[in-house]
Amino acid sequence: MQLYDVVVIGGGHAGCEAAYASARAGAQTALITHKISALGTMSCNPAIGGLGKGHLVREIDAFDGLMGRAADAAGIQFRLLNRRKGPAVRGPRAQADRQLYKEAIQKLLQKQDNLILIEDEVIDLIVKDKSISGVILKKQGILPSGAVVLTTGTFLNGFIHIGDKTWAAGRMGEQSSIKLAERLKSYGINLGRLKTGTPARLSKKTIRWECLPKQQADENPVPFSLLTEKIEQPQIECAITRTNAQTHQIIRENIHRSALYSGNIEGLGPRYCPSIEDKIVKFGERDGHQIFLEPEGLNDDTIYPNGLSTSLPEDVQVSLLKTIEGLENVTILQSGYAIEYDFVNPQQLTKTLELRSLPGLFLAGQINGTTGYEEAAAQGLLAGLNAARKVGGLDEILISRSTAYIGVMVDDLVSRGVCEPYRMFTSRAEFRLSLRSDNADARLTPLAQQLGIVSKLRWECYQKKQQRLDQARSLCQELFLTPNQASAHGLQVNHDGIRRSAYDLLAYPHMSIERLSHIWPQLQSIDSKTVESVEIEAQYAVYLEKQAQDILALQRDERLEIPSSLDVQAISGLSNELKTKIQKISPRSIADAQKIDGMTPAALSLIITYIQRQRREKAKSA
């Protein structure tokens, strides 16, 4: 059997990005999936992006990944969430046509060099000298490889639950990977159990659309990918409805029949995507919960009722749906269900997503305790890239918290672990002013170019974009007004004798290049996309300068090593609780210490000061 550099197990969002990244990095890569026709399937909601998640999609695209381009090709309703808030927390989101999305992913994979797609099931891993050396396939037998990326999603020992019905499955209609789960346990890998759920799918033809308020797409859709010049798909509208007292009563009367509340499910579900049963139990005082009716495609009769995830029996699902306005005569195409699956405690991984106890085995996606397409895809990208570099004898790639949301997520997972499905939010990033969705390519594409995974087309597009931005910034910085001149143009500035540039003025509230172009007509030459970038950059300039200093200080302190001989008890002012935790965990650096639960900036300062003082005293006595 042929030897591959990297074998990727699983064809979901993590697996596709992992295989694509590995192949682009020059590794001979095999992607193993149960069904090639299912590659890129959106198992749950038909949408990409959102708050925090949209940042991840842009970062994947900055590395020349798949997700952004596929979402642009399939997007049928683009919306920028948090539009009225600051640029740092705005979240690009696109509802996608499921079939078009799959087709876009498969097309990109099939034309990628160094990549072969294999339809089979991995039933075992080959371990030699305590390292991964390949996999065993159900049909084709032994497949040697230098590294393996495991992206099992909900398939690892997956079980579907609908009421009191339970059966093994990775998702509806597809088998789970039970033997692989057993094998991982045999290697002493710490596995846990999580669950997620999905709502019933409804027939579009049986919904009373005329009585429901509509949600429109943005008038000017903004693509995810730098390579997308224009969104080609027609933009559709969604409808909004709500549950009501009658709905809630039916759920309460049948709550004991829900798989979630009957004791059949052990794993915790995603906190920020609760089932309708959870909503009624935990937020029973509300008179209704909003439901978004989202078409799954332009030529598809299927509607996804976002907000109605459930594991109630089919008869109860029918009853509760018929109490909701617009759904009185609805037909269910597929029942909602919960799915429970195994995951690996991510604290067992390095920050390259390699398993410490089994070198050569990389994990990405829901197997690491995350939830969401975007989180999975971002992990797949990093794992696939590092797997390829490991086999090629190259340095590992680590992405820091101050560089990207990908770095924030990986650091959270590896340092803190998970007890419930992890979802990305902008609030998780300390340096979110710097980690905006609009500057993902500026942050990451030069790195991707150094790694050799960026196409010639993308690099040219990136350079042209940066050139336009540099020229626009320079123009704004060359145009000045005195306070008196500013007042003459109706601009409110301090009369302090300081001349201010157009760039400086853009930091003022309600200021724009459009307004300043009445003073300086040459600003009209800046194209609309570049205008937005310059305005955001200027608006945040003062804060970004301070944040850059904070990042440098953090990086300097993070690199400070904690000696193994450190006498924690001698550090005055440190709580006994933290002393105990430090002794137990034995952090090797300040970067490790700051992840300890309960650690504060003040406590870190005490540790840093103590270590530096000890070093000075040692140097004097030497």
Swiss-Prot record:
Alphabetized GO MF terms: flavin adenine dinucleotide binding
A single GO cellular-component term on record: cytosol
Residues at which NAD(+) binds: 269-283
InterPro entries the UniProt entry points to: FAD/NAD-bd_sf, GIDA_C_N, MnmG, MnmG-rel, MnmG-rel_CS, MnmG_C, MnmG_C_subdom, MnmG_C_subdom_sf
KW NAD (keyword) present: yes
Binding residue positions for FAD: 10-15, 122, 177, 366
Keywords: Cytoplasm, FAD, Flavoprotein, NAD, tRNA processing
One Pfam family linked to the record: GIDA
GO BP terms, alphabetized: tRNA methylation; tRNA wobble uridine modification
Function according to Swiss-Prot or TrEMBL: NAD-binding protein involved in the addition of a carboxymethylaminomethyl (cmnm) group at the wobble position (U34) of certain tRNAs, forming tRNA-cmnm(5)s(2)U34.
Official protein name in the record: tRNA uridine 5-carboxymethylaminomethyl modification enzyme MnmG
Naturally occurring in which organism (per UniProt): Bartonella henselae (strain ATCC 49882 / DSM 28221 / CCUG 30454 / Houston 1)
